UniProtKB/Swiss-Prot annotation:
The entry's keywords: Disulfide bond, Golgi apparatus, Iron, Iron storage, Metal-binding, Oxidoreductase, Secreted, Signal
Signal peptide: 1-20
GO MF, any single term: ferroxidase activity
Subunit architecture: Oligomer of 12 light (L) chains and 12 heavy (H) chains; L and H chains are disulfide-linked. The functional molecule forms a roughly spherical shell with a diameter of 12 nm and contains a central cavity into which the insoluble ferric iron core is deposited.
Organism: Trichoplusia ni (Cabbage looper)
Protein name listed in UniProt: Ferritin heavy chain
Length: 211
């Protein structure tokens, strides 16, 4: 009996101090002088993040479409799944930038309010490539609008963000648009000459397979 009481007392001795020493961290006040991004610039960046996530979801839908057994175009599927990953990475880069500038300390959930893909099927590869090119053009225009909002602010010209978007994002966008336009042109020429077989050949070339 005494041994049971000793064990019980030992448990209490361990548990009570543990509950008494729980870590309660009070909020701290940090100077805000270093947070210099203005509202119009910040809001346009948040909208751009949503657009990048939306583009990623649309590319996922495109990849899923070309992965269907009744479509079976693995080259196109891989192309669009890779594009989805790139758009997601763009969104992550923008989020990381805002965090570096002291933003996104609250109301992060609004960034997740993204509309679902507008389309889920395409007649063929040409239509899908042209849709992708149109979507990338819209993303490029949106980035230019962000640059304008952050550059033309009468109170604060955000040179650093403008330089970041111009150097890292716009160049990649322009190269991506040119690549999609070239792919669409090549596919159209193949299909003009070989009809449906042309799309099959092009799909294999996307996988690096010579036919």
């Amino acid at each position: 009996m005494n041994s049971i009481l000793l064990v019980f007392a030992g448990i209490l001795a361990v548990c009570l101090p543990a509950s008494a020493t729980q870590c309660n961290v009070n909020p701290v006040q940090i100077p805000k002088d270093w947070i210099t991004m203005h509202r119009s610039c910040r809001n346009s960046m948040r909208q751009q993040i949503q657009m990048e996530v939306g583009a990623s979801l649309q590319y996922l839908a495109m990849g899923a479409h070309f992965s269907k057994d009744v479509v079976n175009r693995p080259g196109f599927a891989q192309l669009f799944f890779d594009a989805a990953s790139e758009e997601r990475e763009h969104a992550m880069k923008l989020i990381e930038y805002l965090l570096m500038r002291g933003e996104l300390t609250n109301d992060v959930s609004s960034l997740l309010q993204v509309r679902p893909p507008t389309r889920s099927s395409w007649k063929g590869g040409v239509e899908a490539l042209e849709h992708a090119l149109s979507m990338e053009s819209d993303v490029t225009k949106s980035i230019r609008n962000v640059i304008k909002a952050c550059e033309d602010d009468s109170e604060f010209n955000d040179y650093h963000l403008v330089d970041y978007l111009t150097g890292d994002f716009l160049e990649e966008q322009y190269k991506g648009q040119r690549d999609l336009a070239g792919k669409a042109s090549t596919l159209k020429k193949l299909m003009d000459r070989h009809e449906a077989l042309g799309e099959f050949i092009f799909d294999k070339k996307l996988l690096g397979i010579d036919v």
